[in-house]
Amino acid sequence: MLNRIRSVFAGERGLPRSQVERLGRLPPGERLAGVGAALHDLCVTTAARFVEEEHRRADSPFGGLPKTDLFHEMLVMNFWALERLFKGRRRALMDQVYDRYSTSFVWGWESGRTDLVDSMRAKFTAYDEAWDDYSGHQDGFARQALAIIFGGTPVAEAPRAAFWLISYADRTMKDFTEVGKSVKLLLRDAA
C-alpha cells in the first residue's frame, strides 16, 4: 500500500511523502482522524502562504485587509475545494477537518461549531452556484469571492483581485485532486 501511495505523490503536490507514509502506518481506527488533521493543516498552510505572499507584494489588492480576515476566508475557500473534491462522499473525514477547525480557529466568535460550519456551508453554496465547470469562465465566482472577502465593499483593484482568486482556487483544486488520490488509498481499509 505504501508504494502505491508513494507513486501518487511522485510530484509532491499536496501532502508531503513523509506525512503520507506516517499516516499509512497508523492503525485503521486512527487513520481517519490523522488524515482529517493532515487535511486541515494543509488547508491552513495553503491559506497562510497566499496571505503572506499577498501582504508582501506592494501592489496587492488584498494589502488593506487584515491578515486574519483574509486568512480565514482563504481557509474557507480551501474547505470548499475539499468539499467539491469529495462530493459529499467523505462526510466523516470532513467532520474531522471541521472539528479541528472549530477548536483551532474561533476568531473571537461567540458561536459554536454548528454555527461556524453553517456559516461556511452558506459560503460553499455561494461558491458552488458561481463556479462554472462547463465554460471555465470564473468571473461569477470571482465576484462572489470578492463580495465575501471584502464584505460587499467595492474593490478598486477588482480585476487583479479576481485574477488572483481564480488562479488560487483553480491551483488549489488541482493540488487537492492529488491529495484526494492519497486519501482514497489511506482510507480504503480505515474504520
Residue ranges and their predicted role:
Residues 22, 26-51, 95-171:
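Polybasic, proline/glycine-rich intrinsically disordered low-complexity segments
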Residues 45-92:
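N-terminal interaction modules that seed assembly of large macromolecular complexes
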Residues 1-38, 187-191:
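Non-catalytic accessory regions used for complex assembly or targeting
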Residues 83-86, 106, 188:
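Hydrophobic/aromatic-lined pockets within catalytic cores
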